[in-house]
Curated annotation (Swiss-Prot):
Family annotation (Pfam families): MraZ (PF02381)
Subunit field text: Forms oligomers.
Record's keyword annotation contains Transcription regulation: yes
Organism: Thermomicrobium roseum (strain ATCC 27502 / DSM 5159 / P-2)
A cellular component term, taken from the record's GO annotations: cytoplasm
Gene (UniProt): mraZ
Main location: cytoplasm
Official protein name in the record: Transcriptional regulator MraZ
InterPro entries recorded: MraZ (IPR003444), MraZ_C (IPR035644), MraZ_dom (IPR020603), MraZ_N (IPR035642), MraZ_sf (IPR038619), SpoVT-AbrB_dom (IPR007159), SpoVT-AbrB_sf (IPR037914)
Length: 142
């Protein structure tokens, strides 16, 4: 389970250290793809597989489903962890998420999100403003 928020530097080669407490679940590799909110999403293989199967089962005749499949799979890449627990963030994914010198690494239970400090600050502001009403709307689902 991934919990917490951490700030890490991105080196000149585009490598990012993943927090030590998260690394064991990845067993040396994971799948990195675009997140929905201008962040990147990093999945352990055992979390990625069920998600990939669900997304793949969406009807190809539905335009929204096709667009979502492209969003999830077109930029997805398998990343390997080096001995220092770093992954390489491909340039196109860094550009999408606005990542430059620093990243906010956020545990979201079964996956990890990687945010630029600016995008994370905007998201945190949104959560502070709308969090109570979001919780109220979703309370019936829990």
């Amino acid at each position: 389970m991934f919990l917490g928020r951490f700030t890490h530097a991105i080196d000149d080669k585009g490598r990012l250290a993943i927090p030590a407490r998260f690394r064991e679940a990845f067993r040396g590799q994971g799948v990195l793809t675009r997140g929905i909110d201008r962040c990147l999403t990093l999945y352990p293989m055992d979390s990625w597989q069920p998600l990939a199967e669900k997304v793949s089962s969406l009807s190809i005749s539905d335009p929204d489903a096709r667009a979502f499949r492209r969003m999830v799979f077109a930029e997805a890449t398998v990343v390997e962890f080096d001995r220092q627990g770093r992954i390489l963030l491909p340039p196109e994914l860094r550009a999408y998420a606005g990542l430059e010198r620093e990243a906010i690494v956020v545990g979201v239970h079964s996956y990890v999100e990687i945010w630029s400090p600016e995008n994370w600050a905007a998201q945190a502001e949104l959560l502070a403003a709308e969090g109570p009403s979001i919780a109220q709307r979703l309370a019936t689902l829990i």
